[in-house]
Amino acid sequence: MATRYWIAALPVADDNVAAGKTALWARLQEAISRHSFDTPLYRFTVPDLRPGTLDSLLALSDDLVKSNIFIEGVSHKIRRQIEDLERAGGVEPGTLTVDGVPVDSYLTRFVWDEGKYPVNAPLKETVASIQSQVAKIEDDMKVRVAEYGNVKSQLGAINRKQTGSLAVRDLSNLIKPEDMVTSEHLVTLLSIVPKYSQKDWLASYESLDTFVVPRSSKKLYEDNEYALYTVTLFAKVVDNFKVHAREKGFQIRDFEYSPEAQESRKQELEKLLQDQEVMRTSPIAMGAMLATVRVFSSWDAFSSAVRVFVESILRYGSACTVPVCCPSTIYKEREKSKEHLGRAMRQYQQLLEI
Protein backbone atom coordinates (compact mmCIF):
# COMPACT_ATOMS: atom_id res chain seq x y z
CA MET A 1 0.00 0.00 0.00
CA ALA A 2 1.66 3.20 -1.20
CA THR A 3 1.52 6.34 0.90
CA ARG A 4 1.89 9.81 -0.52
CA TYR A 5 2.96 12.80 1.56
CA TRP A 6 2.24 16.45 0.98
CA ILE A 7 4.43 18.96 2.80
CA ALA A 8 3.03 22.47 2.93
CA ALA A 9 4.11 25.77 4.49
CA LEU A 10 1.44 28.40 5.13
CA PRO A 11 1.90 32.06 6.14
CA VAL A 12 1.00 33.30 9.61
CA ALA A 13 -0.63 36.70 9.34
CA ASP A 14 -1.15 37.31 13.07
CA ASP A 15 1.40 39.56 14.80
CA ASN A 16 1.25 37.14 17.71
CA VAL A 17 3.16 34.29 16.10
CA ALA A 18 2.24 31.64 18.66
CA ALA A 19 -1.45 32.51 18.59
CA GLY A 20 -1.37 32.78 14.80
CA LYS A 21 0.14 29.32 14.42
CA THR A 22 -2.45 27.82 16.76
CA ALA A 23 -5.33 29.49 14.93
CA LEU A 24 -3.98 28.52 11.50
CA TRP A 25 -3.51 24.93 12.61
CA ALA A 26 -7.11 24.78 13.88
CA ARG A 27 -8.52 26.28 10.65
CA LEU A 28 -6.45 23.91 8.52
CA GLN A 29 -7.60 20.86 10.49
CA GLU A 30 -11.21 21.96 10.09
CA ALA A 31 -10.83 22.51 6.33
CA ILE A 32 -9.07 19.20 5.72
CA SER A 33 -11.58 17.23 7.79
CA ARG A 34 -14.46 18.89 5.91
CA HIS A 35 -13.06 18.08 2.44
CA SER A 36 -11.20 14.83 3.22
CA PHE A 37 -12.29 13.38 6.56
CA ASP A 38 -10.04 10.28 6.24
CA THR A 39 -6.82 12.30 5.88
CA PRO A 40 -4.92 12.77 9.15
CA LEU A 41 -2.90 15.94 9.66
CA TYR A 42 0.44 16.17 11.45
CA ARG A 43 2.77 18.98 12.39
CA PHE A 44 6.07 18.87 10.48
CA THR A 45 8.36 21.04 12.60
CA VAL A 46 11.09 22.93 10.77
CA PRO A 47 13.48 24.99 12.92
CA ASP A 48 14.45 28.60 12.22
CA LEU A 49 17.22 27.88 9.75
CA ARG A 50 19.67 30.46 8.43
CA PRO A 51 18.05 31.76 5.21
CA GLY A 52 20.89 33.85 3.76
CA THR A 53 20.38 36.32 0.90
CA LEU A 54 17.62 36.29 -1.70
CA ASP A 55 20.11 35.39 -4.45
CA SER A 56 21.42 32.45 -2.44
CA LEU A 57 17.88 31.22 -1.78
CA LEU A 58 17.00 31.40 -5.48
CA ALA A 59 20.12 29.43 -6.40
CA LEU A 60 19.48 26.97 -3.59
CA SER A 61 15.90 26.43 -4.74
CA ASP A 62 17.16 25.15 -8.10
CA ASP A 63 19.86 23.05 -6.42
CA LEU A 64 17.32 21.44 -4.09
CA VAL A 65 15.24 20.17 -7.00
CA LYS A 66 18.30 18.43 -8.47
CA SER A 67 19.42 17.24 -5.05
CA ASN A 68 16.04 15.70 -4.25
CA ILE A 69 16.00 13.87 -7.59
CA PHE A 70 19.49 12.50 -6.92
CA ILE A 71 18.74 11.41 -3.35
CA GLU A 72 15.41 9.88 -4.35
CA GLY A 73 17.15 7.87 -7.08
CA VAL A 74 19.77 6.56 -4.66
CA SER A 75 17.08 5.63 -2.13
CA HIS A 76 15.05 3.66 -4.67
CA LYS A 77 18.16 1.96 -6.07
CA ILE A 78 19.32 0.73 -2.66
CA ARG A 79 15.80 -0.35 -1.74
CA ARG A 80 15.63 -2.47 -4.92
CA GLN A 81 18.96 -4.04 -3.97
CA ILE A 82 17.57 -5.01 -0.57
CA GLU A 83 14.48 -6.57 -2.17
CA ASP A 84 16.65 -8.52 -4.63
CA LEU A 85 18.81 -9.83 -1.78
CA GLU A 86 15.78 -10.80 0.27
CA ARG A 87 14.20 -12.60 -2.68
CA ALA A 88 17.50 -14.40 -3.36
CA GLY A 89 17.37 -15.62 0.22
CA GLY A 90 13.79 -16.83 -0.14
CA VAL A 91 12.25 -14.25 2.18
CA GLU A 92 9.61 -11.62 1.56
CA PRO A 93 10.82 -7.99 1.47
CA GLY A 94 10.60 -6.54 4.96
CA THR A 95 9.19 -3.25 6.19
CA LEU A 96 11.60 -0.34 6.21
CA THR A 97 12.12 1.35 9.56
CA VAL A 98 14.07 4.45 10.55
CA ASP A 99 15.64 4.47 14.01
CA GLY A 100 13.48 1.48 14.89
CA VAL A 101 10.13 3.02 13.96
CA PRO A 102 8.06 2.67 10.76
CA VAL A 103 8.62 5.24 8.03
CA ASP A 104 5.17 6.78 8.54
CA SER A 105 5.84 7.33 12.24
CA TYR A 106 9.30 8.73 11.54
CA LEU A 107 7.92 11.35 9.16
CA THR A 108 4.92 12.33 11.23
CA ARG A 109 7.11 12.70 14.34
CA PHE A 110 10.09 14.24 12.59
CA VAL A 111 12.56 16.14 14.78
CA TRP A 112 15.44 18.14 13.31
CA ASP A 113 18.85 16.78 14.34
CA GLU A 114 20.86 19.87 15.31
CA GLY A 115 23.91 17.75 16.10
CA LYS A 116 24.06 16.54 12.53
CA TYR A 117 22.84 19.71 10.82
CA PRO A 118 23.35 22.88 12.95
CA VAL A 119 20.51 25.35 12.45
CA ASN A 120 22.92 28.30 12.30
CA ALA A 121 24.92 26.80 9.42
CA PRO A 122 24.39 28.31 5.94
CA LEU A 123 21.67 26.39 4.12
CA LYS A 124 23.98 25.75 1.18
CA GLU A 125 26.39 23.94 3.51
CA THR A 126 23.54 21.91 5.02
CA VAL A 127 22.32 20.81 1.59
CA ALA A 128 25.87 20.05 0.45
CA SER A 129 26.43 17.99 3.60
CA ILE A 130 23.25 15.97 2.99
CA GLN A 131 24.13 15.33 -0.65
CA SER A 132 27.74 14.46 0.22
CA GLN A 133 26.62 11.89 2.79
CA VAL A 134 24.20 10.32 0.33
CA ALA A 135 26.89 10.20 -2.39
CA LYS A 136 29.27 8.47 0.04
CA ILE A 137 26.58 5.95 0.97
CA GLU A 138 25.98 5.27 -2.73
CA ASP A 139 29.70 4.75 -3.36
CA ASP A 140 30.00 2.38 -0.39
CA MET A 141 27.03 0.37 -1.62
CA LYS A 142 28.48 0.19 -5.13
CA VAL A 143 31.63 -1.43 -3.71
CA ARG A 144 29.62 -3.88 -1.58
CA VAL A 145 27.29 -4.82 -4.41
CA ALA A 146 30.21 -5.19 -6.84
CA GLU A 147 31.89 -7.63 -4.43
CA TYR A 148 28.65 -9.56 -4.06
CA GLY A 149 28.11 -9.55 -7.83
CA ASN A 150 31.63 -10.88 -8.39
CA VAL A 151 30.98 -13.82 -6.05
CA LYS A 152 27.63 -14.49 -7.75
CA SER A 153 29.30 -14.37 -11.15
CA GLN A 154 31.96 -16.87 -10.11
CA LEU A 155 29.33 -19.18 -8.66
CA GLY A 156 27.30 -18.86 -11.84
CA ALA A 157 30.31 -19.81 -13.94
CA ILE A 158 31.01 -22.84 -11.74
CA ASN A 159 27.34 -23.84 -11.82
CA ARG A 160 27.24 -23.64 -15.62
CA LYS A 161 30.32 -25.83 -15.81
CA GLN A 162 28.76 -28.38 -13.49
CA THR A 163 25.28 -28.42 -15.01
CA GLY A 164 25.95 -27.84 -18.71
CA SER A 165 26.16 -30.54 -21.35
CA LEU A 166 29.09 -32.95 -21.39
CA ALA A 167 30.53 -31.00 -24.29
CA VAL A 168 31.32 -28.02 -22.05
CA ARG A 169 30.86 -28.93 -18.38
CA ASP A 170 33.55 -29.68 -15.83
CA LEU A 171 34.19 -33.43 -15.81
CA SER A 172 36.24 -33.68 -12.62
CA ASN A 173 33.31 -34.71 -10.41
CA LEU A 174 32.38 -37.49 -12.86
CA ILE A 175 35.80 -39.17 -12.94
CA LYS A 176 37.18 -41.61 -10.38
CA PRO A 177 40.86 -42.55 -10.03
CA GLU A 178 40.21 -46.09 -11.26
CA ASP A 179 38.70 -44.72 -14.50
CA MET A 180 42.03 -43.31 -15.65
CA VAL A 181 45.12 -45.21 -16.78
CA THR A 182 48.33 -43.21 -16.85
CA SER A 183 51.70 -44.83 -17.36
CA GLU A 184 54.89 -44.30 -19.32
CA HIS A 185 53.27 -45.59 -22.50
CA LEU A 186 49.49 -45.72 -21.93
CA VAL A 187 46.98 -42.91 -21.47
CA THR A 188 43.20 -42.73 -21.03
CA LEU A 189 41.20 -40.23 -23.08
CA LEU A 190 37.65 -39.02 -22.51
CA SER A 191 35.33 -39.08 -25.51
CA ILE A 192 32.07 -37.14 -25.74
CA VAL A 193 29.76 -39.25 -27.88
CA PRO A 194 26.38 -38.02 -29.18
CA LYS A 195 23.67 -39.93 -27.34
CA TYR A 196 22.35 -41.61 -30.47
CA SER A 197 25.83 -42.50 -31.81
CA GLN A 198 26.89 -44.73 -28.93
CA LYS A 199 26.59 -47.93 -30.96
CA ASP A 200 28.76 -46.38 -33.65
CA TRP A 201 31.39 -45.43 -31.04
CA LEU A 202 31.51 -48.90 -29.52
CA ALA A 203 31.76 -50.48 -32.95
CA SER A 204 34.48 -48.19 -34.29
CA TYR A 205 36.71 -46.80 -31.52
CA GLU A 206 39.14 -49.75 -31.64
CA SER A 207 39.71 -49.17 -35.36
CA LEU A 208 40.39 -45.44 -35.10
CA ASP A 209 44.07 -46.35 -34.57
CA THR A 210 46.08 -49.57 -34.42
CA PHE A 211 47.42 -48.80 -30.93
CA VAL A 212 44.05 -48.65 -29.11
CA VAL A 213 43.65 -51.08 -26.21
CA PRO A 214 40.81 -53.48 -27.14
CA ARG A 215 37.63 -53.38 -25.03
CA SER A 216 39.04 -50.45 -23.02
CA SER A 217 36.08 -48.11 -23.53
CA LYS A 218 33.68 -47.67 -20.61
CA LYS A 219 30.67 -45.37 -20.25
CA LEU A 220 30.92 -43.13 -17.19
CA TYR A 221 27.96 -40.78 -17.55
CA GLU A 222 25.11 -39.80 -19.86
CA ASP A 223 22.98 -36.66 -20.14
CA ASN A 224 20.21 -35.64 -22.53
CA GLU A 225 22.62 -35.02 -25.41
CA TYR A 226 25.85 -36.91 -24.89
CA ALA A 227 27.50 -39.90 -23.26
CA LEU A 228 30.94 -39.84 -21.65
CA TYR A 229 33.25 -42.75 -22.56
CA THR A 230 36.83 -43.58 -21.69
CA VAL A 231 39.30 -45.14 -24.11
CA THR A 232 42.86 -46.29 -23.39
CA LEU A 233 45.61 -46.19 -26.01
CA PHE A 234 49.32 -45.67 -26.46
CA ALA A 235 50.42 -42.12 -25.75
CA LYS A 236 52.34 -41.84 -29.02
CA VAL A 237 49.13 -42.03 -31.14
CA VAL A 238 46.95 -39.60 -29.14
CA ASP A 239 47.03 -36.83 -31.74
CA ASN A 240 46.26 -39.22 -34.59
CA PHE A 241 43.38 -40.78 -32.62
CA LYS A 242 41.86 -37.34 -31.92
CA VAL A 243 41.86 -36.51 -35.63
CA HIS A 244 40.11 -39.74 -36.57
CA ALA A 245 37.61 -39.42 -33.71
CA ARG A 246 36.71 -35.87 -34.77
CA GLU A 247 36.13 -37.09 -38.33
CA LYS A 248 33.59 -39.59 -36.95
CA GLY A 249 31.79 -36.89 -34.92
CA PHE A 250 33.30 -37.74 -31.52
CA GLN A 251 34.81 -35.04 -29.29
CA ILE A 252 37.91 -35.87 -27.26
CA ARG A 253 37.96 -33.66 -24.15
CA ASP A 254 41.32 -32.52 -22.83
CA PHE A 255 41.41 -33.69 -19.24
CA GLU A 256 44.11 -34.42 -16.70
CA TYR A 257 42.95 -36.16 -13.56
CA SER A 258 44.32 -34.52 -10.42
CA PRO A 259 42.87 -35.29 -6.97
CA GLU A 260 44.59 -32.17 -5.63
CA ALA A 261 43.02 -29.93 -8.29
CA GLN A 262 39.62 -31.53 -7.72
CA GLU A 263 39.82 -30.93 -3.98
CA SER A 264 40.95 -27.36 -4.61
CA ARG A 265 37.93 -26.71 -6.85
CA LYS A 266 35.64 -28.21 -4.22
CA GLN A 267 37.08 -25.95 -1.53
CA GLU A 268 36.79 -22.94 -3.84
CA LEU A 269 33.10 -23.68 -4.44
CA GLU A 270 32.41 -24.11 -0.72
CA LYS A 271 34.18 -20.83 0.05
CA LEU A 272 32.24 -18.94 -2.63
CA LEU A 273 28.95 -20.32 -1.34
CA GLN A 274 29.90 -19.31 2.19
CA ASP A 275 31.00 -15.84 1.05
CA GLN A 276 27.74 -15.34 -0.83
CA GLU A 277 25.65 -16.29 2.18
CA VAL A 278 27.68 -14.11 4.53
CA MET A 279 27.45 -11.15 2.16
CA ARG A 280 23.74 -11.63 1.63
CA THR A 281 22.90 -11.90 5.32
CA SER A 282 25.46 -9.55 6.82
CA PRO A 283 27.52 -6.78 5.19
CA ILE A 284 25.51 -6.43 1.99
CA ALA A 285 21.94 -6.87 3.20
CA MET A 286 22.40 -5.12 6.53
CA GLY A 287 24.55 -2.46 4.94
CA ALA A 288 21.94 -1.89 2.26
CA MET A 289 19.18 -1.63 4.84
CA LEU A 290 21.22 0.82 6.92
CA ALA A 291 22.08 2.79 3.78
CA THR A 292 18.42 3.00 2.83
CA VAL A 293 17.53 4.27 6.30
CA ARG A 294 20.23 6.94 6.12
CA VAL A 295 19.33 8.01 2.60
CA PHE A 296 15.62 7.97 3.38
CA SER A 297 16.01 10.12 6.47
CA SER A 298 18.20 12.56 4.53
CA TRP A 299 15.90 12.71 1.51
CA ASP A 300 12.38 12.43 2.89
CA ALA A 301 13.01 14.36 6.07
CA PHE A 302 15.93 16.78 6.26
CA SER A 303 16.16 17.58 2.55
CA SER A 304 12.40 18.09 2.34
CA ALA A 305 12.46 20.23 5.47
CA VAL A 306 15.12 22.48 3.95
CA ARG A 307 13.21 22.67 0.69
CA VAL A 308 9.92 23.65 2.29
CA PHE A 309 11.75 26.25 4.40
CA VAL A 310 13.46 27.79 1.35
CA GLU A 311 10.31 27.82 -0.78
CA SER A 312 8.27 29.35 2.05
CA ILE A 313 10.76 32.21 2.42
CA LEU A 314 10.79 32.81 -1.34
CA ARG A 315 7.02 32.82 -1.54
CA TYR A 316 5.98 34.49 1.70
CA GLY A 317 9.08 36.41 2.68
CA SER A 318 10.55 36.19 6.16
CA ALA A 319 7.14 35.99 7.81
CA CYS A 320 6.75 33.09 10.19
CA THR A 321 5.17 29.95 8.78
CA VAL A 322 3.83 26.74 10.20
CA PRO A 323 4.93 23.70 8.18
CA VAL A 324 2.56 20.76 8.23
CA CYS A 325 2.73 17.22 6.90
CA CYS A 326 -0.38 15.76 5.25
CA PRO A 327 -0.18 12.05 4.32
CA SER A 328 -2.71 10.78 1.79
CA THR A 329 -2.92 7.10 0.82
CA ILE A 330 -3.43 6.71 -2.91
CA TYR A 331 -6.16 4.30 -3.91
CA LYS A 332 -8.28 4.40 -7.03
CA GLU A 333 -11.34 4.47 -4.88
CA ARG A 334 -9.94 7.49 -3.07
CA GLU A 335 -9.30 9.64 -6.11
CA LYS A 336 -12.31 11.76 -5.20
CA SER A 337 -10.97 12.24 -1.69
CA LYS A 338 -7.60 13.18 -3.13
CA GLU A 339 -9.19 15.90 -5.28
CA HIS A 340 -11.01 17.29 -2.27
CA LEU A 341 -7.75 17.40 -0.32
CA GLY A 342 -6.04 19.26 -3.16
CA ARG A 343 -8.87 21.77 -3.31
CA ALA A 344 -8.62 22.36 0.42
CA MET A 345 -4.87 22.87 0.28
CA ARG A 346 -5.16 25.29 -2.63
CA GLN A 347 -7.60 27.29 -0.61
CA TYR A 348 -4.91 27.62 2.03
CA GLN A 349 -2.23 28.55 -0.52
CA GLN A 350 -0.46 25.21 -0.74
CA LEU A 351 3.25 25.84 -1.13
CA LEU A 352 4.96 22.54 -1.79
CA GLU A 353 3.85 19.10 -2.93
CA ILE A 354 6.29 16.21 -2.61
From Swiss-Prot:
Keyword S-adenosyl-L-methionine: no
SUPFAM superfamilies found in the cross-reference section: Vacuolar ATP synthase subunit C
Subunit organization: V-ATPase is a heteromultimeric enzyme composed of a peripheral catalytic V1 complex (components A to H) attached to an integral membrane V0 proton pore complex (components: a, c, c', c'' and d).
GO molecular function annotations of the record: proton-transporting ATPase activity, rotational mechanism
Superkingdom to which the source organism belongs: Eukaryota
Name of encoding gene: VATC
Keywords, ordered alphabetically: Hydrogen ion transport, Ion transport, Membrane, Transport, Vacuole
Similarity field: Belongs to the V-ATPase C subunit family.
Key word Ion transport present: yes
An annotated GO cellular component: vacuolar proton-transporting V-type ATPase, V1 domain
Function: Subunit of the peripheral V1 complex of vacuolar ATPase. Subunit C is necessary for the assembly of the catalytic sector of the enzyme and is likely to have a specific function in its catalytic activity. V-ATPase is responsible for acidifying a variety of intracellular compartments in eukaryotic cells.
Name of this chain's protein: V-type proton ATPase subunit C
Cell compartments where the protein resides: Vacuole membrane
